[in-house]
């Protein structure tokens, strides 16, 4: 299995300024992410950033970095530029490892790459796990995905889907037994050729209203295949509290 891991990293975080360079046990967070990605089967790991400080920090710790434009509207656009800089062949599998995931499981990176490689008719592979409880079902920050035959994604939503009419009658908030909904995990694999084309696809109404970029692919008829994992991954870093939690885990010898 051959694939490349790309790590988009931007400095402009409102809740945690300079997040990619936040120290975790003596190394910048983005370097910790690269270390985890390097433990997967990736043949190359590259940090794609719009800031020279991130590139310098990566190089200081022996990791490759690509300087990209600062005006990319999404991380996927940044990856598309990175694919061009690297000159990757269109059939190269590229895994997008988020730059704020210093606890990412290398085995999950391998799994999403293998899922795409086993699905030649799919444009994207991603991951999902069972919903934890009714609170997760109704939480708009927990993205739900429903799948059809062969694990193909039918829809992603912040809303509780599918709507269990009988179980939720009268305003009851429960997770109906056997509800065929999963908690989406934001780890993606693409083919380099699709990444090159993706930024040119116009945003549709579904992506606009849900604010979920992957819906653009579905709206334009591109298949997304979902790898199911039994457990949710360890949470990433969005806030100062998240950062302290991760620091404590590394201090304990993670």
From Swiss-Prot:
One GO-annotated biological process of the protein: lipopolysaccharide biosynthetic process
A single MF term (Gene Ontology): 3-deoxy-manno-octulosonate cytidylyltransferase activity
Gene3D superfamilies, alphabetized: Spore Coat Polysaccharide Biosynthesis Protein SpsA, Chain A
Pfam families, sorted: CTP_transf_3
Subcellular location: Cytoplasm
Superkingdom in the source lineage: Bacteria
E.C. number(s) listed in UniProt: 2.7.7.38
Keyword Transferase: yes
Keywords for this protein: Cytoplasm, Lipopolysaccharide biosynthesis, Nucleotidyltransferase, Transferase
Catalytic activity line of the entry: 3-deoxy-alpha-D-manno-oct-2-ulosonate + CTP = CMP-3-deoxy-beta-D-manno-octulosonate + diphosphate
SUPFAM superfamilies cross-referenced by the UniProt entry: Nucleotide-diphospho-sugar transferases
GO cellular component: cytosol
Pathway listed: Nucleotide-sugar biosynthesis; CMP-3-deoxy-D-manno-octulosonate biosynthesis; CMP-3-deoxy-D-manno-octulosonate from 3-deoxy-D-manno-octulosonate and CTP: step 1/1; Bacterial outer membrane biogenesis; lipopolysaccharide biosynthesis
Family: Belongs to the KdsB family.
Function recorded in the entry: Activates KDO (a required 8-carbon sugar) for incorporation into bacterial lipopolysaccharide in Gram-negative bacteria.
Protein name: 3-deoxy-manno-octulosonate cytidylyltransferase
